[in-house]
C-alpha cells in the first residue's frame, strides 16, 4: 500500500513518487527437499514519470525498490527488490465537461412611433374646445386603432394645433384645451391616464405655409387655414 505524490511539469507530463509498505511472503526449498517460508512487511519506494496521452489514458515509466524481503534464518536470504516497469493506466471520470452554451441575448425590440392626424374642424366647432358628436365618433375609431397597437410599455402624446388667426397667447390656450379634451375622452374609453398626455402647440408648425397669404376675406381665410387646425397623436414605444 503506497501513497502517490505528483508534481506537474507540463499540462500532460508529471513526475511522481510513491511511498508506503508491502506485505510479502517468501518461500524456500533446498536440494534436500526442506521447505520453509516467511512473511513480513517491507518499505516500498518508487519514482517515475507519467504522460497523459488523453484525459483518460496515460503511460508511465517507473522504478520501484523494496527493502529486505525475507528472513535469512528461514528462507536463507534477505534480498532487496528493484523493479523497472512501463505501464498504461486508464482514469475514469475524466471526460471534459461540455462547454456551456452561450446564448446571445435577443436583440432589443425596435421602438417605433406612430403618428395620426385628426382635423380639428371634425372634432370641434370653430374657436371651441368641446368635442362634437362627430368628433367623438372619430376618436372612437382612433381608440380602436390605438388598442390594436397595444402600446403596453409606450405612451401616447396628444398635440393640439391652431391656425394663425388670433393672438399667440389665445391660440396657445385654445390648443392646450383641445388637446386636453382629446386626452380626457381617450382616458374615458380606457387608455391609462399615466400613459397619455396633452401638449398645446399653439399656431406653430403650420402645414399651409404661405398658401393663404393672399386670402383676405375672413371666411375664406378660415377655410384656407383649416389644415393648420388639427390634433396630432403620437404613439411611442410600439
From Swiss-Prot:
Xref: Gene3D superfamilies: 2.40.160.20, OmpA-like domain (3.30.1330.60)
Main subcellular location of this protein, as a coarse class: membrane
Biological process annotations from GO: monoatomic ion transport
Domain (OmpA-like) ranges: 111-238
A GO molecular-function descriptor: porin activity
Membrane-traversing stretches: 1-8, 13-21, 43-52, 57-64, 83-91
Organism superkingdom: Bacteria
Positions annotated as Sequence repeat: 104-105, 106-107, 108-109
GO CC annotations on file: cell outer membrane; pore complex
Disulfide bonds: 212-224
UniProt cross-references to CDD domains, sorted A to Z: OmpA_C-like
Protein topology in the membrane: Multi-pass membrane protein
Pfam family, one: OmpA
Oligomer status and interactors: Monomer and homodimer.
Function: With TolR probably plays a role in maintaining the position of the peptidoglycan cell wall in the periplasm. Acts as a porin with low permeability that allows slow penetration of small solutes; an internal gate slows down solute passage.
Family from the record: Belongs to the outer membrane OOP (TC 1.B.6) superfamily. OmpA family.
Name this polypeptide is given: Outer membrane protein A
Lineage of origin: Bacteria, Pseudomonadati, Pseudomonadota, Gammaproteobacteria, Enterobacterales
Amino acid at each position: 500500500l503506497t501513497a502517490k505524490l505528483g508534481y506537474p511539469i507540463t499540462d500532460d507530463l508529471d513526475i511522481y513518487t510513491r511511498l508506503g509498505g508491502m506485505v510479502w511472503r517468501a518461500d524456500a526449498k533446498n536440494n534436500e527437499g526442506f521447505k520453509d517460508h516467511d512473511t513480513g512487511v517491507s518499505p516500498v519506494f518508487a519514482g517515475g514519470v507519467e504522460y497523459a496521452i488523453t484525459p483518460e489514458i496515460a503511460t508511465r515509466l517507473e522504478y520501484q525498490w523494496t527493502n529486505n524481503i525475507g528472513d535469512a534464518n528461514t528462507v536463507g536470504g534477505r534480498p532487496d527488490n528493484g523493479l523497472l516497469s512501463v505501464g498504461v493506466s486508464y482514469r475514469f471520470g475524466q471526460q471534459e465537461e461540455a462547454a456551456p452554451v452561450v446564448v446571445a441575448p435577443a436583440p432589443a425590440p425596435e421602438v417605433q412611433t406612430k403618428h395620426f392626424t385628426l382635423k380639428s374642424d371634425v372634432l370641434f366647432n370653430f374657436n371651441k374646445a368641446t368635442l362634437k358628436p362627430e368628433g367623438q365618433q372619430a376618436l372612437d375609431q382612433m381608440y380602436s386603432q390605438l388598442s390594436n397597437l397595444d402600446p403596453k410599455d409606450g405612451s401616447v402624446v396628444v398635440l393640439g394645433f391652431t391656425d394663425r388667426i388670433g393672438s399667440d397667447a389665445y391660440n396657445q390656450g385654445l390648443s392646450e384645451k383641445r388637446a386636453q379634451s382629446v386626452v380626457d375622452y381617450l382616458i374615458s374609453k380606457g387608455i391609462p391616464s399615466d400613459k397619455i398626455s396633452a401638449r398645446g402647440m399653439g399656431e406653430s408648425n403650420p402645414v399651409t405655409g404661405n398658401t393663404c397669404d393672399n386670402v383676405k376675406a375672413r371666411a375664406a381665410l378660415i377655410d384656407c387655414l383649416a389644415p393648420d387646425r388639427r390634433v396630432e397623436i403620437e404613439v411611442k414605444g410600439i
